[in-house]
């Protein structure tokens, strides 16, 4: 079973006002270091966004630790598993935004699109005339996507607003738009931005691709390929297990675990090809 793989990977976010987020950094970092937890936590005045990994007991204790702060209590998170820690360090970063859209003072709290449960997602995206937009970056989409979804071709989420403005030109604002991303946080902002352009029927996949893969299995799934993740697993399969189908972009051969620890934006190169490039 996947749960016997040894390490739990937990991804979560919450938009909530954290006026003291600067002070929270050292407290969270110290707790994680004491419990052998590694990963990345982003703190901003507008909330928290994180993916962490550790042994089961350590992860349970971490969320009990978050419960001590009423703003972060009862945190919902997506869980997957790995045979090794998929992070080499524990980082707690302070940012202006928990996910960078590139528009100063853009408030998504009152405009975000309508959440759609994974069980209802298939019916939504197969409706005639529904526009399905993948809000992730191009290098993520290459690993997998929902069939017939629109790829904005971005290299950074900050490029999404410019793409959306151009895409929206001349379109009927009453059309249906369904949006998705890895864990849901980018869609909180991208759906709100699309609504700010005048679109009314805007939806997004609740909990993102990871939640969908947990909820919709086998022949019922409309997901094709793997799902890129921002850790040393690089991608997970339909069972949210580390993908065994990751190949070198140059020779298409197998890539060792050591080479997966230095992947930049999905550009995977095996050791042999790296050596050939240097020589």
UniProtKB/Swiss-Prot annotation:
One of its GO terms (molecular function) is oxidoreductase activity, acting on paired donors, with incorporation or reduction of molecular oxygen. The keyword S-adenosyl-L-methionine does not apply. Keywords: Oxidoreductase, tRNA processing. It catalyses: uridine(34) in tRNA + AH2 + O2 = 5-hydroxyuridine(34) in tRNA + A + H2O. The keyword Oxidoreductase applies. The active site is at 181 (cysteine persulfide intermediate). One of its GO terms (biological process) is tRNA modification. It holds the Pfam family UPF0176_N. It is an enzyme of class 1 (oxidoreductase). Residues 126-221 form the Rhodanese domain. Catalyzes oxygen-dependent 5-hydroxyuridine (ho5U) modification at position 34 in tRNAs. PANTHER family: RHODANESE-LIKE DOMAIN-CONTAINING PROTEIN 7-RELATED, THIOSULFATE SULFURTRANSFERASE/RHODANESE-LIKE DOMAIN-CONTAINING PROTEIN 2. Belongs to the TrhO family. This is tRNA uridine(34) hydroxylase. It comes from Anaplasma phagocytophilum (strain HZ).
């Amino acid at each position: 079973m996947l749960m016997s793989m040894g390490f739990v990977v937990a991804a979560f976010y919450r938009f909530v006002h954290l006026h003291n987020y600067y002070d929270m950094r050292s407290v969270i970092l110290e707790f994680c270091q004491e419990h052998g937890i590694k990963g990345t936590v982003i703190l901003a005045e507008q909330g928290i966004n994180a993916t962490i990994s550790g042994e089961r007991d350590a992860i349970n204790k971490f969320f009990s630790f978050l419960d001590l702060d009423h703003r972060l209590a009862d945190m919902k998170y997506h869980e997957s598993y790995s045979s090794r820690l998929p992070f080499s360090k524990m980082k707690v970063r302070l940012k202006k935004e928990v996910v960078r859209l590139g528009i100063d003072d853009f408030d998504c709290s009152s405009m975000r699109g309508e959440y759609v449960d994974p069980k209802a997602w298939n019916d939504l995206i197969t409706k005639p005339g529904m526009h399905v937009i993948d809000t992730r970056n191009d290098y993520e989409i290459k690993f997998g996507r929902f069939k017939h979804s629109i790829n904005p071709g971005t290299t950074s989420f900050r490029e999404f607003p410019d793409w959306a403005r151009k895409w929206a030109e001349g379109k009927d604002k009453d059309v249906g738009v369904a949006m998705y991303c890895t864990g849901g946080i980018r869609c909180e902002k991208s759906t709100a931005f699309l609504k700010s352009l005048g679109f009314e029927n805007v939806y997004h996949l609740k909990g993102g691709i990871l939640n969908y893969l947990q909820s919709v299995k086998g022949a019922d799934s409309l997901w094709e390929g793997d799902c890129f993740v921002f850790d040393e697993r690089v991608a997970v399969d339909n069972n949210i297990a580390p993908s065994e189908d990751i190949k070198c972009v140059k020779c298409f051969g197998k890539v060792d675990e050591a080479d997966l620890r230095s992947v930049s934006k999905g550009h995977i190169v095996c050791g042999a090809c790296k050596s050939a490039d240097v020589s």
